[in-house]
């Protein structure tokens, strides 16, 4: 399984109904949905994951679970996205098998090279711009960081962090295979339209 070029991934936020947000994102043309809800119970995550996976099948999109390998496995997700402090890629691969996508969050070429060596399929790179989605101890890395990370890893990059309609084209031009957003869609009064506009800008 591979990451399509010029992909928009919509990540669920901490407030919205994740299933409804996923439905609107898919209707707007998102090619990937990531379920991320740090405070949710395992049962809630599993129930949401099963429903979002069904929606993604309907729209022929990819479904990724953040952090939770167990939920990804139980819900037959297309992949899992791991942070630097999560279960190692090799351990996740042993549980999920060779066909499941495994993404890893990185912010430096050395982290990228390590993730590639361990068998990651793609990289989540950021945060690119200032973002309000969570507290960030480090400053944004900017679009200039994307190319060295690609060169160090040879993996497709999905950029994240402060990406919105006004700067998404800059991110794609810098070499990213796709972008991931949270508030640019979930914080919009019309998530379907917001997704559609982002997809249009990405594909220009």
Curated annotation (Swiss-Prot):
GO terms for biological process: thiamine biosynthetic process; thiamine diphosphate biosynthetic process. Keywords: Magnesium, Metal-binding, Thiamine biosynthesis, Transferase. It comes from the Bacteria. Pathway: Cofactor biosynthesis; thiamine diphosphate biosynthesis; thiamine phosphate from 4-amino-2-methyl-5-diphosphomethylpyrimidine and 4-methyl-5-(2-phosphoethyl)-thiazole: step 1/1. CDD domains: TMP_TenI. Mg(2+) binds at residues 67, 86. One of its GO terms (molecular function) is magnesium ion binding. Its cofactor is Mg(2+). 4-amino-2-methyl-5-(diphosphooxymethyl)pyrimidine binds at residues 34-38, 66, 105, 134. One of its GO terms (cellular component) is cytoplasm. It is an enzyme of class 2 (transferase). It catalyses: 2-[(2R,5Z)-2-carboxy-4-methylthiazol-5(2H)-ylidene]ethyl phosphate + 4-amino-2-methyl-5-(diphosphooxymethyl)pyrimidine + 2 H(+) = thiamine phosphate + CO2 + diphosphate; 2-(2-carboxy-4-methylthiazol-5-yl)ethyl phosphate + 4-amino-2-methyl-5-(diphosphooxymethyl)pyrimidine + 2 H(+) = thiamine phosphate + CO2 + diphosphate; 4-methyl-5-(2-phosphooxyethyl)-thiazole + 4-amino-2-methyl-5-(diphosphooxymethyl)pyrimidine + H(+) = thiamine phosphate + diphosphate. Its EC number is 2.5.1.3. SUPFAM superfamilies: Thiamin phosphate synthase. It holds the Pfam family TMP-TENI. 2-[(2R,5Z)-2-carboxy-4-methylthiazol-5(2H)-ylidene]ethyl phosphate binds at residues 131-133, 162, 182-183. Binds 1 Mg(2+) ion per subunit. Belongs to the thiamine-phosphate synthase family. Condenses 4-methyl-5-(beta-hydroxyethyl)thiazole monophosphate (THZ-P) and 2-methyl-4-amino-5-hydroxymethyl pyrimidine pyrophosphate (HMP-PP) to form thiamine monophosphate (TMP). This is Thiamine-phosphate synthase. It comes from Chlorobaculum parvum (strain DSM 263 / NCIMB 8327) (Chlorobium vibrioforme subsp. thiosulfatophilum). The lineage of its organism: Bacteria, Pseudomonadati, Chlorobiota, Chlorobiia, Chlorobiales.
């Amino acid at each position: 399984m591979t990451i399509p070029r010029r992909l928009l991934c919509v990540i669920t936020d901490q407030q919205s109904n994740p299933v409804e947000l996923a439905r609107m994102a898919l209707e707007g043309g998102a090619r990937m949905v990531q379920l991320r809800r740090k405070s949710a119970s395992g049962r809630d995550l599993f129930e949401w994951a099963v429903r979002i996976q069904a929606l993604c099948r309907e729209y022929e999109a990819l479904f990724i679970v953040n952090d939770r390998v167990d939920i990804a496995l139980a819900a037959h997700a297309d992949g899992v996205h791991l942070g630097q402090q999560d279960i190692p890629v090799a351990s996740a691969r042993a549980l999920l098998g060779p066909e499941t996508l495994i993404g890893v969050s990185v912010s430096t070429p050395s982290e990228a090279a390590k993730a590639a060596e361990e068998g990651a399929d793609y990289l989540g790179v950021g945060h690119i711009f200032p973002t309000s989605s969570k507290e960030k101890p480090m400053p944004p890395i900017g679009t200039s960081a994307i190319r060295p990370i690609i060169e160090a890893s040879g993996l497709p990059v999905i950029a994240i962090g402060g990406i919105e309609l006004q700067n998404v084209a800059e991110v794609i031009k810098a070499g990213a295979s796709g972008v991931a957003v949270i508030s640019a869609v979930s914080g919009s009064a019309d998530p379907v339209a917001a997704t559609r506009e982002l997809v249009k800008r990405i594909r220009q």
